[in-house]
Amino acid sequence: MAAKIKKGALVRVVKEKLENSLEAKASDSRFPSYLFDSKGEIIEMNDEYALIRFYVPTPSVWLRLDQLEAVE
């Protein structure tokens, strides 16, 4: 799945993978609905993480690549 994901791609957050992650356990696990109900665009990447911009007035967020799926 991560092989298809590249900078500029539209992605959706996989709820099950984010909710059960170490990151979720280390912070507030009440995620806003836009994370799962809308598409985001990858604006930056490194080996394991992608910076996602959602089209709502909120800051961009870094998420692990395995927590994302490409959308058309």
Curated annotation (Swiss-Prot):
The keyword DNA repair does not apply. It holds the Pfam family NdhO. It is a peripheral membrane protein. Its EC number is 7.1.1.-. It is found in: Cellular thylakoid membrane. The keyword Iron does not apply. InterPro entries: NdhO (IPR020905). It catalyses: a plastoquinone + NADH + (n+1) H(+)(in) = a plastoquinol + NAD(+) + n H(+)(out); a plastoquinone + NADPH + (n+1) H(+)(in) = a plastoquinol + NADP(+) + n H(+)(out). Transmembrane segments: none annotated. GO terms for cellular component: plasma membrane-derived thylakoid membrane. Keywords: Membrane, NAD, NADP, Plastoquinone, Quinone, Thylakoid, Translocase, Transport. One of its GO terms (molecular function) is quinone binding. NDH-1 shuttles electrons from an unknown electron donor, via FMN and iron-sulfur (Fe-S) centers, to quinones in the respiratory and/or the photosynthetic chain. The immediate electron acceptor for the enzyme in this species is believed to be plastoquinone. Couples the redox reaction to proton translocation, and thus conserves the redox energy in a proton gradient. Cyanobacterial NDH-1 also plays a role in inorganic carbon-concentration. HAMAP family: NDH1_NDH1O. NDH-1 can be composed of about 15 different subunits; different subcomplexes with different compositions have been identified which probably have different functions. This is NAD(P)H-quinone oxidoreductase subunit O. It comes from Crocosphaera subtropica (strain ATCC 51142 / BH68).
